[in-house]
Amino acid sequence: MGLTIGVDIGGTKIAAGVVDEEGNILSTHKVPTPTTPEAIVDAIASAVEGARVGHEIVAVGIGAAGYVNRQRSTVYFAPNIDWRQEPLKEKVEARVGLPVVVENDANAAAWGEYKFGGGKGHRNVICITLGTGLGGGIIIGNKLRRGHFGVAAEFGHIRMVPDGLLCGCGSQGCWEQYASGRALVRYAKQRANATPERAEVLLALGDGTPDGIEGKHISVAARQGCPVAVDSYRELARWAGAGLADLASLFDPSAFIVGGGLSDEGDLVLDPIRKSYKRWLVGGNWRPVADVIAAQLGNKAGLVGAADLAREPDPIM
């Protein structure tokens, strides 16, 4: 079909990239993310125009955080942008003069990993992103499954603990409250408060107090064998693996692809997740067990996936 542009709307920058049919990024253009909804639309158009210079572009795919309708045109609701029933497709098309599709950013990243990253060779995969929160995407039979209204795969808000921790969504006990970057930092702070003698390495990396602990400190301390840091990763993995076991019962994929910032830690995170997953998988000793694979595209997955989805007339069900 030719070259397409993928757009990734980040908290601080909007990135647009020209992507070929093999998932290669040929050029990129980045602009700062504005603070107002209409200015963000203008910034998306600016990023697209900057990236398309010198290329013949056939379509644009935009990855947006929030709920996107099944027609891939309107953002129902975006938690960090004041978009409510935002006709994003229509507005961007009017500015850039190209066909535009809009996709949930986690779905776009999942598609990118499935098509060009860790999911290559699989027909049925579940992707989860372990970052500040927890997101994901469902690919079954080589199709991205979005549900009847287009808002499936909000895995982070599956209720794991009835009457559990309060979530930013307004519910309680959501999975991302127990398996995410925020959860990891909370575990480390709690453990450092309770047993500071087991957190000396970790505390020394910050300001010397539990409140000063950051995610980057936990990674460094864990690799140095700090007991509190290692235990914090194990607790995160316990919840992540338990959730994967539930998803296996629902979807029976051949593989789980784990992406997001926490996946950059490699086997420090993935090995205990695999162990927890097998521990909680019903009939795990007697049935085939899906692989748990690290994502390969890093922060490029959303841009590449959005660009590729723009080529498809309707790949989503």
Curated annotation (Swiss-Prot):
GO terms for cellular component: cytoplasm. Induction: Transcribed from its own promoter, as well as another upstream of the preceeding gene (AC P40182). Expressed when grown on glucose or galactose, levels decrease as cells enter stationary phase. Its EC number is 2.7.1.2. It comes from the Bacteria. PROSITE patterns: ROK. ATP binds at G6, V7, D8, I9, G10, G11, T12. It is found in: Cytoplasm. GO terms for biological process: glycolytic process. GO terms for molecular function: ATP binding; glucokinase activity. Keywords: ATP-binding, Cytoplasm, Glycolysis, Kinase, Nucleotide-binding, Repressor, Transferase. It catalyses: D-glucose + ATP = D-glucose 6-phosphate + ADP + H(+). InterPro entries: ATPase_NBD (IPR043129), ROK (IPR000600), ROK_cs (IPR049874), ROK_glcA (IPR004654). It holds the Pfam family ROK. A probable glucose kinase. Required for glucose repression of many different genes, restores glucose kinase activity in E.coli glk mutants. Homooligomer (possibly a homotetramer). Alternatively, it may form a heterotetramer of two glucokinase subunits with two ORF2 (AC P40182) proteins. Belongs to the ROK (NagC/XylR) family. NCBIfam families: ROK_glcA_fam. This is Glucokinase.
